[in-house]
Amino acid sequence: MDLPKTLHDFLLVFLGSGLILGSLGVVLLTNPIFSAFSLGLTLVCISLLYILSNSHFVAASQLLIYVGAINVLIIFGVMFMNGSEYYQDFRLWTVGDGMTLMVCTSIFISLITTIPDTSWYGIIWTTRSNQIIEQDLISTSQQIGIHLSTDFFLPFELISIILLAALIGAIVVARQ
């Protein structure tokens, strides 16, 4: 968006704060419904950050897929669960939590050290070796469609099969 710098910075800080608070709510809230709603807040803040960075197609995809489908499915699944079984054996800290914290911290540190050294310009504009897409010739939506039907056809189909299996599993669980 073409916003004044002060408004852009304010929105960036506001959405970043919402993102941090929502993600802390996902992890720290003990009620699964509140945790799922915090996940929805986090995903909406991410899509608004995409809008702020002029990635409107990615923002629309984020809202439709994650907030509109995945988060609704999570809330639907949480409402079918029996809530009493989660509060019987509640421990504040376990060995698995410590191991998970160590693994996540090491992944976070490796990402923080790797991301600034990456040449993102070459990754974004180069599709195959020695082939560069001209920005003025085709729009971003057409580029995404071309990539999904050529370069990323197999991963796209594999993801659709995985989602179909998850949908069938959800139907089987709901019928029981």
Swiss-Prot record:
EC annotation from Swiss-Prot or TrEMBL: 7.1.1.-
GO CC aspect terms: chloroplast thylakoid membrane
One Gene Ontology MF term: quinone binding
Gene3D superfamilies found in the cross-reference section: NADH-ubiquinone/plastoquinone oxidoreductase chain 6, subunit NuoJ
Membrane topology of the entry: Multi-pass membrane protein
Cited InterPro entries: NAD(P)H-Q_Oxidoreduct_6 (IPR050290), NADH_UbQ/plastoQ_OxRdtase_su6 (IPR001457), Nuo/plastoQ_OxRdtase_6_NuoJ (IPR042106)
Compartment(s): Plastid, Chloroplast thylakoid membrane
Enzyme class, UniProt record, top EC level: translocase
Transmembrane segments: 10-30, 32-52, 63-83, 92-112, 152-172
Catalytic activity: a plastoquinone + NADH + (n+1) H(+)(in) = a plastoquinol + NAD(+) + n H(+)(out); a plastoquinone + NADPH + (n+1) H(+)(in) = a plastoquinol + NADP(+) + n H(+)(out)
Alphabetized UniProt keyword annotations: Chloroplast, Membrane, NAD, NADP, Plastid, Plastoquinone, Quinone, Thylakoid, Translocase, Transmembrane, Transmembrane helix, Transport
Similarity comment: Belongs to the complex I subunit 6 family.
Subunit details: NDH is composed of at least 16 different subunits, 5 of which are encoded in the nucleus.
Function description: NDH shuttles electrons from NAD(P)H:plastoquinone, via FMN and iron-sulfur (Fe-S) centers, to quinones in the photosynthetic chain and possibly in a chloroplast respiratory chain. The immediate electron acceptor for the enzyme in this species is believed to be plastoquinone. Couples the redox reaction to proton translocation, and thus conserves the redox energy in a proton gradient.
UniProt protein name: NAD(P)H-quinone oxidoreductase subunit 6, chloroplastic
Name of the encoding gene: ndhG
